[in-house]
Amino acid sequence: MTNSQKIIKYFAIAFAIFLIYTISSAIITSVGIIIKSFDKKPNDEVLELKEIYTSDNINSLDIDLNATNLIIKTDEKVSIQTNNSYIKVKEKLGVLKIEEYDNISSKPKDLIVYIPSSILDEIDIETGAGTIYADELNAKRLDLSLGAGTVTLLKVDSDIAKIDGGTGKFEIRDGRINNLDFDAGIGDVYIKSKLEGSNKIDTGVGKVTLDLIGRDYKLSVEKGIGTILIDNKKAVNNETFGNGKNHVLISGGVGEIEV
Protein backbone atom coordinates (compact mmCIF):
# COMPACT_ATOMS: atom_id res chain seq x y z
CA MET A 1 0.00 0.00 0.00
CA THR A 2 1.42 3.38 -1.01
CA ASN A 3 1.62 6.38 1.32
CA SER A 4 -1.17 8.07 -0.64
CA GLN A 5 -3.39 5.03 -0.23
CA LYS A 6 -2.59 4.92 3.48
CA ILE A 7 -3.52 8.58 3.87
CA ILE A 8 -6.86 8.01 2.15
CA LYS A 9 -7.44 4.84 4.17
CA TYR A 10 -6.83 6.39 7.60
CA PHE A 11 -8.79 9.56 6.86
CA ALA A 12 -11.68 7.40 5.66
CA ILE A 13 -11.49 5.23 8.78
CA ALA A 14 -11.33 8.25 11.08
CA PHE A 15 -14.26 9.97 9.35
CA ALA A 16 -16.35 6.79 9.28
CA ILE A 17 -15.76 6.08 12.97
CA PHE A 18 -16.59 9.69 13.83
CA LEU A 19 -19.85 9.52 11.88
CA ILE A 20 -20.83 6.18 13.40
CA TYR A 21 -20.05 7.37 16.92
CA THR A 22 -21.93 10.66 16.45
CA ILE A 23 -25.02 9.03 14.94
CA SER A 24 -25.05 6.20 17.50
CA SER A 25 -24.69 8.64 20.40
CA ALA A 26 -27.58 10.73 19.11
CA ILE A 27 -29.81 7.67 18.68
CA ILE A 28 -28.97 6.25 22.11
CA THR A 29 -29.55 9.61 23.79
CA SER A 30 -32.88 10.12 22.04
CA VAL A 31 -34.12 6.62 22.80
CA GLY A 32 -32.99 6.95 26.42
CA ILE A 33 -34.94 10.18 26.84
CA ILE A 34 -38.08 8.64 25.34
CA ILE A 35 -37.87 5.48 27.43
CA LYS A 36 -37.17 7.47 30.55
CA SER A 37 -40.30 9.55 29.95
CA PHE A 38 -42.61 6.50 29.70
CA ASP A 39 -40.84 3.80 31.68
CA LYS A 40 -40.40 4.47 35.40
CA LYS A 41 -39.19 1.06 36.54
CA PRO A 42 -38.25 0.70 40.21
CA ASN A 43 -35.01 -1.03 39.17
CA ASP A 44 -33.80 2.18 37.54
CA GLU A 45 -33.69 3.82 40.96
CA VAL A 46 -31.41 1.18 42.55
CA LEU A 47 -27.92 2.65 43.02
CA GLU A 48 -26.55 0.48 45.84
CA LEU A 49 -24.08 -2.22 44.84
CA LYS A 50 -25.30 -5.71 45.67
CA GLU A 51 -23.38 -8.97 45.66
CA ILE A 52 -25.01 -11.30 43.14
CA TYR A 53 -22.47 -14.13 42.81
CA THR A 54 -19.65 -15.85 44.70
CA SER A 55 -17.40 -18.80 43.92
CA ASP A 56 -14.16 -20.33 45.12
CA ASN A 57 -12.55 -20.51 41.71
CA ILE A 58 -13.06 -20.23 37.94
CA ASN A 59 -11.02 -21.17 34.86
CA SER A 60 -12.14 -18.48 32.41
CA LEU A 61 -13.98 -15.15 32.39
CA ASP A 62 -16.35 -13.96 29.65
CA ILE A 63 -17.89 -10.48 30.00
CA ASP A 64 -20.27 -8.81 27.53
CA LEU A 65 -21.55 -5.33 28.47
CA ASN A 66 -23.59 -2.66 26.72
CA ALA A 67 -23.30 0.50 28.82
CA THR A 68 -21.91 -0.39 32.25
CA ASN A 69 -18.65 0.63 33.93
CA LEU A 70 -16.43 -2.39 34.59
CA ILE A 71 -14.05 -2.66 37.55
CA ILE A 72 -11.92 -5.79 38.01
CA LYS A 73 -10.14 -6.26 41.34
CA THR A 74 -8.05 -9.05 42.82
CA ASP A 75 -9.26 -11.13 45.76
CA GLU A 76 -8.87 -14.65 47.12
CA LYS A 77 -12.33 -15.68 45.94
CA VAL A 78 -14.50 -14.86 42.94
CA SER A 79 -17.41 -12.49 43.56
CA ILE A 80 -19.55 -10.01 41.64
CA GLN A 81 -21.20 -6.79 42.77
CA THR A 82 -23.43 -4.54 40.67
CA ASN A 83 -26.23 -1.98 40.81
CA ASN A 84 -27.47 -3.04 37.38
CA SER A 85 -30.50 -5.35 37.45
CA TYR A 86 -29.93 -6.22 33.79
CA ILE A 87 -26.72 -8.12 34.57
CA LYS A 88 -27.04 -11.89 34.27
CA VAL A 89 -24.43 -14.36 35.53
CA LYS A 90 -23.95 -18.04 34.83
CA GLU A 91 -21.13 -20.52 35.28
CA LYS A 92 -20.58 -23.66 33.23
CA LEU A 93 -17.55 -25.95 33.24
CA GLY A 94 -15.44 -23.35 35.00
CA VAL A 95 -16.33 -20.52 32.60
CA LEU A 96 -17.94 -17.52 34.30
CA LYS A 97 -20.22 -15.68 31.85
CA ILE A 98 -21.40 -12.15 32.71
CA GLU A 99 -23.81 -10.54 30.28
CA GLU A 100 -25.87 -7.35 30.18
CA TYR A 101 -29.34 -7.48 28.64
CA ASP A 102 -31.35 -4.58 27.19
CA ASN A 103 -30.05 -1.81 29.42
CA ILE A 104 -30.97 1.59 27.96
CA SER A 105 -31.27 3.43 31.27
CA SER A 106 -29.64 6.85 31.38
CA LYS A 107 -28.39 6.24 34.94
CA PRO A 108 -24.73 5.17 35.35
CA LYS A 109 -24.28 1.51 36.27
CA ASP A 110 -21.26 -0.29 37.71
CA LEU A 111 -20.07 -3.88 37.69
CA ILE A 112 -17.30 -4.96 40.07
CA VAL A 113 -15.71 -8.36 39.50
CA TYR A 114 -13.30 -9.84 42.04
CA ILE A 115 -10.98 -12.58 40.73
CA PRO A 116 -7.80 -14.25 42.05
CA SER A 117 -4.43 -13.05 40.75
CA SER A 118 -3.64 -16.54 39.42
CA ILE A 119 -3.55 -16.99 35.64
CA LEU A 120 -6.87 -17.94 34.02
CA ASP A 121 -7.19 -19.94 30.82
CA GLU A 122 -9.00 -17.12 29.02
CA ILE A 123 -10.36 -13.63 29.63
CA ASP A 124 -12.79 -12.31 27.01
CA ILE A 125 -14.26 -8.82 27.46
CA GLU A 126 -16.56 -7.01 25.02
CA THR A 127 -17.99 -3.59 25.84
CA GLY A 128 -20.20 -0.97 24.24
CA ALA A 129 -19.85 2.20 26.31
CA GLY A 130 -18.38 2.72 29.77
CA THR A 131 -15.04 2.86 31.55
CA ILE A 132 -12.88 -0.18 32.30
CA TYR A 133 -10.46 -0.41 35.21
CA ALA A 134 -8.54 -3.56 36.18
CA ASP A 135 -5.96 -4.23 38.88
CA GLU A 136 -4.67 -7.27 37.00
CA LEU A 137 -5.61 -9.25 33.90
CA ASN A 138 -3.71 -12.56 33.97
CA ALA A 139 -4.70 -15.08 31.31
CA LYS A 140 -3.18 -17.51 28.86
CA ARG A 141 -5.42 -15.93 26.23
CA LEU A 142 -6.74 -12.36 26.44
CA ASP A 143 -9.34 -10.94 24.05
CA LEU A 144 -10.61 -7.37 24.46
CA SER A 145 -13.15 -5.77 22.11
CA LEU A 146 -13.67 -2.22 23.33
CA GLY A 147 -16.30 0.43 22.68
CA ALA A 148 -16.38 4.01 23.92
CA GLY A 149 -14.74 4.94 27.22
CA THR A 150 -11.47 5.13 29.13
CA VAL A 151 -9.58 1.87 29.71
CA THR A 152 -6.98 1.58 32.50
CA LEU A 153 -5.21 -1.74 33.07
CA LEU A 154 -2.65 -1.66 35.88
CA LYS A 155 -1.03 -4.99 34.98
CA VAL A 156 -1.44 -7.49 32.16
CA ASP A 157 0.14 -10.94 31.87
CA SER A 158 -0.84 -13.01 28.84
CA ASP A 159 0.58 -15.67 26.52
CA ILE A 160 -1.46 -14.40 23.58
CA ALA A 161 -3.52 -11.20 23.42
CA LYS A 162 -5.84 -9.57 20.91
CA ILE A 163 -7.07 -6.06 21.67
CA ASP A 164 -9.45 -4.07 19.45
CA GLY A 165 -9.46 -0.48 20.65
CA GLY A 166 -12.52 1.71 20.70
CA THR A 167 -13.00 5.41 21.32
CA GLY A 168 -11.21 6.89 24.33
CA LYS A 169 -7.93 6.71 26.21
CA PHE A 170 -6.31 3.28 26.53
CA GLU A 171 -3.57 2.51 29.06
CA ILE A 172 -1.54 -0.51 30.20
CA ARG A 173 0.76 0.53 33.04
CA ASP A 174 2.77 -2.70 33.43
CA GLY A 175 2.82 -6.09 31.81
CA ARG A 176 4.26 -9.09 30.02
CA ILE A 177 2.46 -9.91 26.80
CA ASN A 178 3.36 -12.58 24.27
CA ASN A 179 2.11 -12.28 20.67
CA LEU A 180 0.11 -9.07 21.05
CA ASP A 181 -2.25 -8.07 18.24
CA PHE A 182 -3.34 -4.51 19.05
CA ASP A 183 -5.65 -2.52 16.78
CA ALA A 184 -6.08 1.00 18.13
CA GLY A 185 -9.21 3.05 17.62
CA ILE A 186 -9.63 6.76 18.35
CA GLY A 187 -7.83 8.20 21.36
CA ASP A 188 -4.41 8.25 23.02
CA VAL A 189 -2.73 4.92 23.79
CA TYR A 190 -0.05 4.21 26.40
CA ILE A 191 1.40 0.72 26.76
CA LYS A 192 4.20 -0.12 29.20
CA SER A 193 4.99 -3.80 28.88
CA LYS A 194 7.49 -6.45 27.92
CA LEU A 195 6.41 -7.73 24.50
CA GLU A 196 7.54 -11.24 23.64
CA GLY A 197 7.30 -13.26 20.44
CA SER A 198 5.66 -11.72 17.36
CA ASN A 199 3.65 -8.56 18.01
CA LYS A 200 1.67 -6.16 15.83
CA ILE A 201 0.61 -2.63 16.77
CA ASP A 202 -1.83 -1.15 14.25
CA THR A 203 -2.42 2.43 15.31
CA GLY A 204 -5.55 4.50 14.70
CA VAL A 205 -6.29 8.15 15.42
CA GLY A 206 -4.39 9.69 18.34
CA LYS A 207 -0.98 9.57 20.00
CA VAL A 208 0.51 6.15 20.74
CA THR A 209 3.28 5.69 23.31
CA LEU A 210 5.04 2.31 23.64
CA ASP A 211 7.19 2.07 26.75
CA LEU A 212 8.86 -1.27 26.08
CA ILE A 213 10.38 -3.17 29.01
CA GLY A 214 13.73 -4.73 28.12
CA ARG A 215 15.88 -4.24 25.02
CA ASP A 216 15.74 -7.58 23.15
CA TYR A 217 13.59 -6.23 20.30
CA LYS A 218 13.42 -5.94 16.55
CA LEU A 219 11.12 -3.08 15.50
CA SER A 220 9.67 -2.80 11.99
CA VAL A 221 7.93 0.39 10.91
CA GLU A 222 5.15 0.91 8.38
CA LYS A 223 4.62 4.64 8.40
CA GLY A 224 1.20 6.25 8.05
CA ILE A 225 0.25 9.87 8.71
CA GLY A 226 2.22 11.51 11.48
CA THR A 227 5.63 11.11 13.06
CA ILE A 228 7.12 7.87 14.38
CA LEU A 229 9.92 8.32 16.93
CA ILE A 230 12.11 5.37 17.96
CA ASP A 231 14.38 6.38 20.87
CA ASN A 232 13.82 10.01 19.80
CA LYS A 233 14.91 9.23 16.23
CA LYS A 234 12.43 9.97 13.46
CA ALA A 235 11.65 6.77 11.55
CA VAL A 236 10.95 6.43 7.84
CA ASN A 237 8.70 3.93 6.09
CA ASN A 238 9.88 0.28 6.10
CA GLU A 239 12.75 1.04 8.48
CA THR A 240 13.96 -1.59 10.97
CA PHE A 241 15.49 -1.02 14.40
CA GLY A 242 17.42 -3.62 16.41
CA ASN A 243 17.90 -7.35 15.88
CA GLY A 244 16.39 -8.84 19.05
CA LYS A 245 14.35 -12.04 19.25
CA ASN A 246 11.08 -10.23 20.07
CA HIS A 247 9.55 -8.67 16.95
CA VAL A 248 7.21 -5.66 17.03
CA LEU A 249 5.58 -4.46 13.80
CA ILE A 250 4.31 -0.89 14.12
CA SER A 251 1.81 0.21 11.48
CA GLY A 252 1.26 3.94 11.65
CA GLY A 253 -2.13 5.61 11.56
CA VAL A 254 -3.13 9.23 12.13
CA GLY A 255 -1.08 10.79 14.91
CA GLU A 256 2.28 10.57 16.61
CA ILE A 257 3.91 7.30 17.67
CA GLU A 258 6.67 7.26 20.26
CA VAL A 259 8.68 4.19 21.28
Say what each PLM segment does.
Residues M1-I7:
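N-terminal Lys/Arg-rich, disordered targeting/topogenic segments
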Residues T29-E122, E126, T131-L137, R141, ...:
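Short linear S-[DN]-x-LW-Φ motif typified by the pepsin-like aspartic protease active-site region
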